[in-house]
């Protein structure tokens, strides 16, 4: 039996400790053999000073804080002296206040109570009892002494395992008039001597008590919610809480408290919650899994338990059908994010421990959250196999999602999972933490607008996949959000193959309208829900994007999103029970002629796709149908770079000064022609035909030196928003769009089918891969014109410049005669004799090539500034323009301290797209960017090599 100290109990006096020692109390200072700390009440005679911070006199001269004001009459007639409003009133039902000791000068540097409060208190003549009067632990004090000793030892273990500046304190239950309350007074805690304000915050926490059986957040507080729900709760920053959710908010702001984690503590059987461990930090915290793991191991060492961290062996999913579905989902996420510049898209999948997939027999992935509320029931966890991050700044939010799960009705994704359809919210930051557990991270990473849709795949039957898209925070206008939402739906529709809406409603049925739920968080913790229809231009070539609009439908109110029935409102406004119906899906046929396509050649492919109402991937597929494998304006830049390099090489040769003028090149030198269609070129009058070339070649690559139309200057494409860095979670293969401009030999050779009809029909499944363009075309007016004598034997150039222009290797192949010395006569370039054409491109002598190779020009020996991003790190260095890919990877690996074979590198090209550097030719093209653009820095993106989707098993990964 845990007996109280006789002398202390008899005299009511305790030995006076120093205040500094108490502020920095450690577990080593605890008397484990002493009495239960709340079994006695320390008093002094009226002539002595108060000796302990936990002592509060019961005299009227020093009234007790409202914290301790408990009525013996069941909670009637309470008045308190707090500065809060109606939200902080003591519940008339519970009669238990959970407010701070706001006016006690020993603890707080705040001002004295207002005159109005003193008047009210005086008017009621209410005498507060002693704070510890009648506060005793439950009946089994023997058990409590053992538990307290174990908790003390567990905190000692935790202190040894962490080096962070953290306050760890225990909240234990006590009883008052049959009520269970939580207090940290007299309980063990650990605190670094350099607490940075945490010691004062510890003293503030001593003045708080929280109810564990109240319905009010004010009375429950963070420890009360965790104790009552037996679930952990954590936040990156307590300042994202409201004062109702976190009653110590003012003190947290004052003492710079940020990250907080509260974990329930269970007895060895795991059935009963016996307390709460609270970890408090002065810095923001995103990843709490390591701290949870340390606390759990410390508790396990003393035969106690907490929320289990999922460190068991990773569940493998050997299910080819599911991997096929995830591969298709990844393609949809990729295209949508790239097309509409969304910062993040991810996939949530329902997970139930021990359940089996409907098809294939593989085990479903266990929930990655350390919140144990999902045990035995369905919740949603993010999958690391189908997510796409465009903005590298939101990786922290993505990582936080891995530590959380969502139940039905929580957040936008939870609502979409609940109704089996789609859900949209304009501001997810208005939710409280119970409505959306990730709301604090959304505030932290400035994510506001979210859209989610629940899909099923024919590969996996009834398994649901909830796709969650976050819209750019810069788009705040409702109409702009609606337009973007319609465009997202169009893009998704065009790339669906096996996917369908889980509710059975097909895209585009009922006159191109889709019904979905719009939710809005209300101040009273309710959710306002309404069903609206969006009209989207699924036949996008005939409709304008501005036709996308929302059609209001009758409002559906929801106050309990988790338990409400699943109803779907039809377009007619009649709410019916959802019935899953299998409907035959058809492909929308779209037609674009080559004449229409040519009108957009001067601009970028993205601008053309937007103007025509399609996504860039569909635009690429249309181009391939016409035999156009590379968008013209993209190739113009590479052609110009190649001509510039050609000019430098020629000028570096002795004896050619004034013999060749490359500064007067005109657009007419390099026309865009088509060898199999009669489409008229740009700016030509109606009915005119392009001149026929002698020796007509059916190859798509043609050069002409005689007649060709002029092409207006194209507007350069604007770069994406600042700091956007793109990366994928899987290897870019197996049905995902590939990067442009990769090394030789990795292009997809598609059969070119002659298309005699200038109007074509697109149908069937969308193309998964888009090879680098190889179509030659007009060069902008900023290009150069070669003299006719140089172009006398233009057949030698045919196909070379366009196929892979821009790399030094191809430039040497393109113009071998550029490497010659003074042994060559000037008449080789300028002779008017017809025979000169035969000798113009004769292979140079080996000695001449050797001389040039040994004496590179100064431009070839220049250095280039590289700025590379890897996760949260950015490195900057310089390399020689003649470096190879292995030298680049060695430099990156040396600075990032990673292995050279564990990552891939991409560069930001002229079209602001991330292109994979797969070989030396890619690197040389990358290093030429500063010469052709305004920037002086080459930007690289380093990302880890991830598992290929083609593998047989999926790994969930460990936290």
Swiss-Prot record:
Phenotype when changing residue 223 to S: In Mut164; loss of nitrate sensing
> What turns on this gene?
Not regulated by the N source or by nitrate.
Where, per UniProt, does this protein localize? Nucleus
Q: Which residues form a coiled coil?
A: 633-654
**Residue ranges under compositional bias (Polar residues)?**
9-18, 673-687, 694-703, 735-745
Cellular component per GO, a single term:
nucleus
Q: Name one Pfam family in it.
A: GAF_NLP
Q: What does this protein do?
A: Transcription factor involved in regulation of nitrate assimilation and in transduction of the nitrate signal.
Spell out the protein name for this chain.
Protein NLP7
The lineage is: Eukaryota, Viridiplantae, Streptophyta, Embryophyta, Tracheophyta
Name of encoding gene:
NLP7
């Amino acid at each position: 039996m845990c007996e109280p100290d006789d002398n202390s109990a008899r005299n009511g006096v305790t030995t006076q400790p120093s205040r500094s020692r108490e502020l920095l109390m450690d577990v080593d200072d605890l008397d484990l053999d002493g009495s239960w700390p709340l079994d006695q009440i320390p008093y002094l005679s009226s002539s002595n000073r108060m000796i302990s911070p936990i002592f509060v006199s019961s005299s009227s001269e020093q009234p007790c804080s409202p914290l301790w004001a408990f009525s013996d009459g069941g909670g009637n007639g309470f008045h308190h002296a707090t500065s809060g409003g109606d939200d902080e009133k003591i519940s008339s039902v519970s009669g238990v206040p959970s407010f701070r000791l706001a006016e006690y000068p020993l603890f707080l540097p705040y001002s004295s109570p207002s005159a109005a409060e003193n008047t009210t208190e005086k008017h009621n003549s209410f005498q507060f009892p002693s704070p510890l009067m009648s506060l005793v632990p439950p009946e089994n004090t023997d058990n409590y002494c053992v538990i307290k000793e174990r908790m003390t030892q567990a905190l000692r273990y935790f202190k040894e395992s962490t080096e962070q500046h953290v306050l760890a304190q225990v909240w234990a239950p006590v009883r008052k008039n049959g009520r269970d309350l939580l207090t940290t007074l007299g309980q063990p805690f650990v605190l670094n001597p350099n607490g940075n304000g945490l010691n004062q915050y510890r003293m503030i926490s001593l003045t708080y008590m929280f109810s564990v059986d109240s319905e009010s957040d004010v009375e429950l507080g963070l420890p009360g919610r965790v104790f009552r729900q037996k679930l952990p709760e954590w936040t990156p920053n307590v300042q994202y809480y409201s004062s109702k959710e976190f009653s110590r908010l003012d003190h947290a702001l004052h003492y710079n408290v940020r990250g907080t984690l509260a974990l329930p503590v269970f007895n060895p059987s795991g059935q009963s919650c016996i307390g709460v461990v609270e970890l408090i930090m002065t810095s923001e915290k995103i990843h709490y899994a390591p701290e949870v793991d340390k606390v759990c191991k410390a508790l396990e060492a003393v035969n106690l338990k907490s929320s289990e961290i999922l460190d068991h062996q990773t569940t493998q999913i050997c299910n080819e059908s599911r991997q096929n579905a995830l591969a298709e989902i990844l393609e949809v996420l990729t295209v949508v994010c790239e097309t509409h510049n969304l910062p993040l898209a991810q996939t949530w999948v329902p997970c139930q421990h021990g359940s089996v997939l409907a098809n294939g027999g593989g085990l479903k992935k266990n929930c990655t959250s350390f919140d144990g509320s999902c045990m035995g029931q369905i919740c949603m966890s993010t999958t690391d196999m189908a997510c796409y991050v465009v903005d590298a700044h939101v990786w922290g939010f993505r990582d936080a999602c891995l530590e959380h799960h969502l139940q039905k009705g929580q957040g936008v994704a939870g609502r979409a999972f609940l109704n089996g359809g789609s859900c949209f919210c304009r501001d997810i930051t208005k939710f409280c933490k119970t409505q959306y557990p990730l709301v604090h991270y959304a505030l932290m990473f400035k994510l506001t607008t979210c859209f989610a849709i629940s899909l099923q795949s024919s590969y996996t039957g009834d398994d649901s996949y909830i796709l969650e898209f976050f819209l750019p925070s810069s788009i705040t206008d409702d109409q702009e959000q609606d337009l973007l939402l319609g465009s997202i739906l169009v893009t998704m529709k065009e790339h669906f193959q096996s996917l369908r809406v889980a509710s059975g409603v097909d895209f585009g049925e009922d006159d191109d309208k889709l019904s979905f739920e719009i939710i809005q968080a209300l101040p009273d913790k309710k959710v306002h829900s309404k069903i609206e229809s969006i009209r989207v231009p699924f036949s996008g070539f005939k409709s304008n994007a501005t036709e996308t609009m929302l059609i209001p439908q009758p409002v559906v109110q929801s106050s309990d999103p988790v338990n409400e029935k699943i109803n779907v409102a039809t377009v007619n406004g009649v709410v019916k029970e959802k019935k899953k119906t299998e409907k035959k899906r058809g492909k929308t046929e779209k037609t674009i002629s080559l004449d229409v396509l040519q009108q957009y050649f001067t601009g970028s492919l993205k601008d053309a796709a937007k103007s025509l109402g399609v996504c860039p991937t569909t635009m690429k597929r249309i181009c391939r149908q016409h035999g156009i494998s590379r968008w013209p304006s993209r190739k113009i830049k590479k052609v110009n770079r190649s001509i510039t390099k050609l000019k430098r090489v020629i000028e570096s040769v002795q004896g050619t000064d004034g013999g060749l003028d490359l500064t007067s090149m005109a657009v007419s030198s390099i026309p865009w022609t088509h060898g199999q269609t009669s489409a008229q070129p740009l700016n030509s009058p109606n009915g005119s035909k392009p001149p026929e070339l002698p020796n007509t070649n059916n190859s798509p690559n043609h050069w002409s030196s005689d007649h060709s139309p002029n092409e207006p200057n194209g507007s350069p494409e604007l770069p994406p928003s600042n700091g956007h860095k793109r990366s994928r979670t899987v290897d870019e293969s197996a049905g995902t769009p590939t990067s442009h401009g990769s090394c030789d030999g990795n292009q997809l050779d598609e059969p070119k089918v002659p298309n005699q009809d200038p109007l074509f029909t697109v149908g069937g499944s969308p193309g998964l891969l888009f090879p680098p363009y190889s179509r030659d075309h007009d060069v902008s007016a900023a290009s150069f014109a070669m003299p006719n004598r140089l172009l006398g034997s233009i057949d030698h150039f045919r196909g070379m410049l366009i196929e892979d222009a821009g790399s030094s290797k191809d430039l040497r192949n393109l113009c071998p005669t550029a490497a010659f010395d003074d042994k060559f006569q000037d008449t080789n370039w300028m002779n008017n004799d017809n025979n000169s054409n035969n000798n113009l491109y004769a292979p140079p002598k080996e000695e001449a090539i050797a001389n040039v190779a040994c004496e590179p020009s100064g431009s070839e020996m220049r250095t280039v500034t590289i700025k590379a991003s890897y996760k949260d790190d950015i490195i900057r260095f310089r390399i020689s323009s003649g470096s190879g890919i292995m030298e680049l990877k060695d430099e990156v690996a040396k600075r990032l301290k990673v292995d050279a074979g564990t990552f891939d590198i991409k560069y930001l090209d002229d079209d602001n797209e991330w292109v994979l550097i797969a070989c030396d030719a890619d690197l040389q093209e990358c290093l030429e960017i500063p010469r052709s653009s305004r920037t002086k820095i080459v930007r690289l993106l380093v990302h880890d090599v991830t598992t290929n989707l083609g593998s047989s098993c999926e790994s969930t990964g460990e936290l």
